[in-house]
Curated annotation (Swiss-Prot):
Record organism: Methanothermobacter marburgensis (strain ATCC BAA-927 / DSM 2133 / JCM 14651 / NBRC 100331 / OCM 82 / Marburg) (Methanobacterium thermoautotrophicum)
Pfam families in UniProt: AAA, AAA_lid_PRS2_C, PRS2_N
UniProt xrefs under Gene3D superfamilies: 1.10.8.60, P-loop containing nucleotide triphosphate hydrolases
Lineage, top ranks: Archaea, Methanobacteriati, Methanobacteriota, Methanomada group, Methanobacteria
The entry's keywords: ATP-binding, Nucleotide-binding, Proteasome
Keyword Nucleotide-binding: yes
Protein known as: Putative 26S proteasome regulatory subunit homolog MTBMA_c13930
Length: 372
């Protein structure tokens, strides 16, 4: 067996050759920069903790005490032997490289990057969203409120739920609302609010609403609400998810008066939402699949911008795309047909390309069996 950088290699277990960088044990490491990596493997009995050195001087003493005498080679790993046995730290920088850690070595721990929320900007207008008139009416009411939050106060439209099939324009309408008002839009997926450890998610939610309040009037759009707000009958609620839900309920209830902040939640499955969350939304707006006239408008709009002419009847396309969302029509029919035409080096999109796209969509839409 060979021990190198606190790792034991057994030649009987592996035939791989490990390049061992020559090190000078007499050279003292002046600086070592570490990055928390985690355990060599994971199992359901343990979770990889988030490492933050609250007291950097104390961490340096802790690190030197256990790794004194170890080789500091860039790209290698040091394993904790005390508080978190076998937790790995990668040596990002060692100066000089291949030197020895001593009592005089300065050891720095890289901080974990924290989730930051950024304003989403777009040039989409409500006229770009075809159909969904009920949702547009609600958005115009929200616009009235955000133009003069002090006038509405307790009568403000604070929490609204958008629901409906994927690709029906929920996110697009939220973007158009913020764009037309020129107010900040914070667009996030609910799954990103679940932190690595208990406490992370709640902190992120409070920071999100604090930021939205500071930049009010503003809109918070939370997509995939069912990822955190799933009815308790359908899940065994984990601690990290539970604290996210509680933090979200606190903000939506207005305990912290977030005047000028509107929360729009979005889900494809409103019936799966827990009543505690669903009841906080004052109104639910359904986004419906486009009808014949709406599909015709979408098709004409999309075809007009395509790089190749389309030699196929729009009226026939309206019939063939029945039951499809706007996103399906654009991404899975027209785009697939266009790419097929380009692959065939055809000067235009023809019937055979449309038929190919529709066939491909049907194949991808078929339910897959558990066993092949």
């Amino acid at each position: 067996m060979v021990k190198f950088n606190n790792i034991v290699y057994d030649p009987q277990l592996t035939d791989k050759k490990f390049p061992v960088k020559a090190s000078d044990p007499e050279r003292e490491a002046k600086l070592v920069v570490l990055q928390p990596v985690g355990y060599p493997f994971v199992c359901n009995l343990m979770e990889s903790p988030r490492i933050d050195a609250v007291n950097k001087e104390l961490f340096e003493i802790y690190a030197r005490d256990q790794w004194e005498g170890f080789s500091a080679t860039e790209g290698s790993y040091l394993f904790d032997q005390k508080l978190l046995p076998d937790y790995a730290f990668k040596i990002i920088r060692a100066h000089p490289d291949g030197s020895k850690i001593t009592r005089n070595t300065s050891i720095i721990l890289l901080e974990n990057e924290r989730e930051e929320f950024h304003e989403v900007k777009s040039d989409i207008t409500m006229d770009d969203v075809i159909g969904q008139e009920d949702a547009k009416i609600k958005c115009r009411i929200i616009m009235r409120y955000l133009e003069d939050p002090d006038r509405f106060r307790d009568w403000a439209p604070r929490n609204v739920l958008f629901h409906g099939s994927p690709g029906t324009g929920k996110t697009m309408l939220a973007k158009s609302l913020a764009n037309e008002l020129r107010v900040p839009l914070y667009l996030i997926k609910a799954t990103s609010l679940i932190g690595e450890h208990v406490g992370d998610g709640a902190r992120q939610i409070h920071e999100l609403y604090e930021l939205a309040s500071k930049t009010a009037p503003s809109v918070i759009f939370i997509d995939e609400m069912d990822a955190i707000g799933l009815d308790r009958r359908f899940q065994s609620l984990r601690g990290d998810v539970s604290e996210v839900v509680n933090a979200l309920l606190t903000e939506m209830d207005g305990i912290n008066q977030n005047w000028g902040v509107v929360t729009i939640g979005a889900t494809n499955n409103p019936e799966l939402l827990d009543n505690a969350i669903r009841s906080r939304f004052e109104e639910e707006i359904e986004f419906k699949l486009p009808g014949d006239d709406e599909r015709r408008m979408m098709l004409e709009k999309y075809i007009e911008t395509m790089p190749l002419d389309v030699d196929f009847s729009v009226d026939k396309l309206v019939k063939l795309t029945k039951g499809m969302s706007g996103r399906d029509i654009k991404e899975r029919v027209l785009k697939t047909a266009l790419h097929r035409a380009l692959a065939d080096e055809s000067p235009r999109v023809e019937r055979e390309h449309i038929e190919y796209a529709l066939k491909e969509r049907d194949l991808k839409s078929e339910p897959r069996h558990m066993f092949a």
